[in-house]
Curated annotation (Swiss-Prot):
Top-level taxonomic group: Eukaryota
Name the record gives this protein: Chalcone synthase
Biological-process GO terms, alphabetical: flavonoid biosynthetic process; polyketide biosynthetic process
Family indicated by similarity: Belongs to the thiolase-like superfamily. Chalcone/stilbene synthases family.
Organism: Dianthus monspessulanus
């Protein structure tokens, strides 16, 4: 009879969790940032607030965003005017949208990841579904499983209402699942729809308007597993370590509350300062065992909460301008998609590395870091190792 130690050893994978495929998706409705202030104040019937509109225009100009994608169209907003009020009773309307749209958009990204992976979907053993856009039972994980036609016995995990750091959370969870379940293939999906938080402007809550200037819709998907079969699977990144921490003296810096008026966000002005002040500690904890202390020797995948966060992190660490290029490109092309952002940046990183003729998926470097920042203030840190590119 086998001992419990032998059973546990047999259940564990030999190698590290590895990202094997990436897929992304957005709604078809593109919003161009240069036009957005006029559009936003028109659809919310707020054009009489001329001074506030100019403040919002400056927010959009400083956002470093060129384009975002949104499920909400002008037609949908005309049919649901309660979404356009600042604090209109609207949760039922919002929930009816996101309960169906979150898994639908997630499916689009997942189908692309599964196609790139190239294996039958019956080989998926676990599903991690993540969204900050609404809640429901059975959850978006169940709906995604049904939409994709996955096995009824697939093991599901649902993460609701975690916020912008959750792209790191799902990687940390996927790492543990892949490394502790031999042969596991984990489908990870982050899907976000801003219908849960869209609202009209008010002078009384400029932090709410910052969110209106930044947030966009998108879904990202990964296939994660250990010990890849190199005859049929193509590794992209390995995960060496993952951790989470609460930053000191940061309570209330980022809050989100799901209420009858939808999801409201509240931000303190010093969020970039709090993050930049503490980021060195997070890096040292993650990389001192590896022997890396020059942060320019890493490839970078950082959640783009906004340009001020990126600017202060860059300055604090003395990063070269190109270090955050992939992050800034995603912010520019898609806006802040909450949990899905870092999955888009992973996709941008491997594609850019291939386009540029780099020797690895991490811009020619071996080691990289993925950061998620969000409510708490919570920081997720994932240590990544690139794989060689046959250019």
């Amino acid at each position: 009879m086998a001992s419990i130690e032998e059973i546990r050893q047999a259940q564990r994978a030999d190698g590290p969790a590895t990202i094997l495929a990436i897929g992304t998706a957005t709604p078809p409705n593109a919003i161009y940032q240069a036009d957005y202030p006029d559009y936003y104040f028109r659809v919310t019937k707020s054009e009489h607030m001329t001074e506030l509109k100019e403040k919002f225009r400056r927010m959009c100009d400083k956002s470093m965003i060129k384009k975002r994608y949104m499920y909400l169209t002008e037609e949908i907003l005309k049919e649901n005017p309660n979404l356009c009020e600042y604090m209109g009773s609207s949760l039922d309307t919002r929930q009816d949208m996101v309960v169906s749209e979150v898994p639908r958009l997630g499916k689009e990204a997942a189908v692309k990841a599964i196609k790139e992976w190239g294996q039958p979907k019956s080989k998926i053993t676990h599903v991690i579904m993540c969204t900050t856009s609404g809640v429901d039972m059975p959850g978006a994980d169940y709906q995604l499983t049904k939409l994709l036609g996955l096995r009824p016995s697939v093991r599901r995990f649902m993460l609701y209402q975690q916020g912008c750091f959750a792209g790191g959370t799902v990687l940390r969870l996927a790492k543990d699942l892949a490394e502790n379940n031999k042969g596991a293939r984990v489908l990870v999906v982050c899907s976000e729809i801003t219908a849960i938080c869209f609202r009209g402007p008010t002078e009384a809550a400029l932090d709410s308007m910052v969110g209106q200037a930044l947030f966009g819709d998108g879904a990202g998907a990964l296939i994660v597993g250990s010990d890849p079969d190199l005859s049929i699977e193509r590794p992209l990144f390995q995960m060496a370590w993952a951790g989470q921490t609460l930053l000191p003296d940061s309570e209330g810096a980022i809050d989100g509350h799901l209420r009858e008026v939808g999801l409201t966000f509240h931000l303190l002005k010093d969020v970039p300062g709090i993050i930049s002040k503490n980021i060195t500690n997070a890096l040292e904890e993650a990389f001192s065992p590896i022997g890396v202390s020059d942060w320019n020797n890493l490839f970078w995948i950082a959640h783009p909460g906004g340009p001020a966060i990126l600017d202060q992190v860059e300055a604090k660490l003395g990063l070269k301008e190109e270090k955050l290029a992939a992050t800034r490109n995603v912010l520019s092309d898609f806006g802040n998609m909450s949990s899905a952002c870092v999955l888009f940046i992973l996709d941008e990183m491997r594609k850019k590395s291939l386009r540029d003729g780099a020797t690895t998926t991490g811009e020619g470097l071996d080691w990289g870091v993925l950061f998620g920042f969000g409510p708490g203030l919570t920081v997720e840190t994932v240590v990544l190792h690139s794989v060689p590119l046959n250019c």
